[in-house]
Swiss-Prot record:
Catalyzes the transfer of the phosphoribosyl group of 5-phosphorylribose-1-pyrophosphate (PRPP) to anthranilate to yield N-(5'-phosphoribosyl)-anthranilate (PRA). Pathway: Amino-acid biosynthesis; L-tryptophan biosynthesis; L-tryptophan from chorismate: step 2/5. This is Anthranilate phosphoribosyltransferase. InterPro entries: Anthranilate_Pribosyl_Tfrase, Glycosyl_Trfase_fam3, Glycosyl_Trfase_fam3_N_dom, Glycosyl_Trfase_fam3_N_dom_sf, Nuc_phospho_transferase. It comes from Sulfurisphaera tokodaii (strain DSM 16993 / JCM 10545 / NBRC 100140 / 7). Anthranilate 1 binds at residues 79, 109. 5-phospho-alpha-D-ribose 1-diphosphate binds at residues 79, 82-83, 87, 89-92, 106-114, 118. It catalyses: N-(5-phospho-beta-D-ribosyl)anthranilate + diphosphate = 5-phospho-alpha-D-ribose 1-diphosphate + anthranilate. It is an enzyme of class 2 (transferase). Disulfide bonds: none annotated.
Length: 345
């Protein structure tokens, strides 16, 4: 089926097969079709609603066109973003903490709609975000942490960047980042911008051959575990999917923290709040990071439940600042980090 026939199929609101989606995604990322056709596919899919097969096919195509490192046992904590709430970079904080006890290949990018992306906050801390594959494998083996910058590891995405920017609306590519980790990480925490998208993404995860993944969407449509209200969770192990909800009570906590108290102005502010939380000088941020770290510890089976996970997370935060310093010493510049630490002390 040629490109025009596939486009007509979408216009008729018919779903593409996984192979059809993979084929057109490869053509798009290799710039084999005009930008106007790419725009037609992206808008058509968004209007129709992306199917499980289409998400899976596009994710496999992104993997086909990516640079890779070999570390499938790693954990990633990348979310979809796009919740518009401008909270501190909790998934990056979790990645830094977990790397004290388990290898983390943190896949991420600069902010698109928010105040600070994972690349931005790591850069604000002084970490070198441009890490090529050979060095990346060395770092994760030696220090249990590496950042895999999406712009570097997905060079073919430059061929759709202009279309995405011009359209200015959410497309299928917004949900693909977490599904395309360059280390082929088989353990993953994925925050999702909408709870309605969770079942569909869970089915795609099953098709993409992970070992264990936890998807979640917290109140109020936050792509993190929330300190306020209910968080919807989908836990996937191989081909088994279990869904449930959690609240702060499941972590052994009582008082909710409004999400409005967890916002940041920019990447430097986010970095500062993370370090303050590690130091015990920002209680709201500490709890937010703590419950998300607890879920990650549960995912990688370091704890039996979320209450134990939260207690363990507090211990990891207590040693968080020296650990982050050691990561930056290996791959970065301590100037920014030291200035931030001075502001805390």
């Amino acid at each position: 089926m040629n490109t025009a026939e596939l486009l007509r199929k979408i216009i008729r609101r018919e779903n593409l097969t996984e192979d059809e989606a993979r084929s057109i995604a490869n053509s798009v990322m290799k710039a084999e079709v005009p930008e106007i056709v790419t725009a037609g596919f992206l808008v058509g899919l968004a209007t129709k609603g992306e199917s499980v097969e289409e998400i899976t096919g596009f994710a496999k195509a992104m993997r086909d066109n990516a640079l890779h490192i070999n570390f499938p046992s790693a954990l990633d904590t990348a979310g979809t973003g796009g919740d518009g709430l401008n909270t501190l970079n909790v998934s990056t904080a979790v990645a830094l903490l977990i790397s004290q006890v388990y290898p983390v290949a943190k896949h991420g990018n600069r902010a698109v709609s928010g105040k600070s992306g994972s690349a931005d906050v790591l850069e604000a801390l002084g970490y070198n975000i441009i890490v090529k594959p050979e060095l990346a494998e060395k770092l994760i083996k030696e220090s249990k942490f590496v950042f895999l910058f999406a712009q570097l590891y997905h060079p073919a995405m430059k061929n759709v960047a202009n279309v995405r920017k011009t359209l200015g609306v959410r497309t299928i590519f917004n949900v693909l980042g977490p599904l395309t980790n360059p280390a082929n990480a088989r353990y993953q925490m994925i925050g999702v911008f909408s709870k309605e998208f969770l079942p569909k993404l869970a089915e795609a995860v099953v098709r993409l051959d992970y070992d264990r993944v936890i998807l979640y969407n917290g109140f109020p449509s936050l792509d993190e575990i929330s300190t306020q209200g209910i968080t919807y969770v989908y836990e996937i192990e191989k081909d088994k999917i279990v869904s449930y909800t959690v609240s702060i009570n499941d972590f052994g906590l009582k008082d909710e923290i409004p999400v409005s108290k967890l916002t940041v102005n920019d990447a430097t502010h986010s970095a500062l709040r993370i370090l303050k939380a590690f130091k015990g000088k920002d209680e709201e941020a500490r709890r937010f990071i703590g419950i998300n770290t607890a879920m990650a510890l549960y995912l990688i089976r370091k704890v039996k439940d979320l209450k134990d996970g939260y207690e363990y997370a507090l211990q990891l935060m207590d040693s968080g600042i020296p650990h982050v310093r050691s990561l930056i010493e290996k791959n970065g510049d301590l100037s920014n980090f030291n200035k931030l630490v001075e502001k805390i002390d």
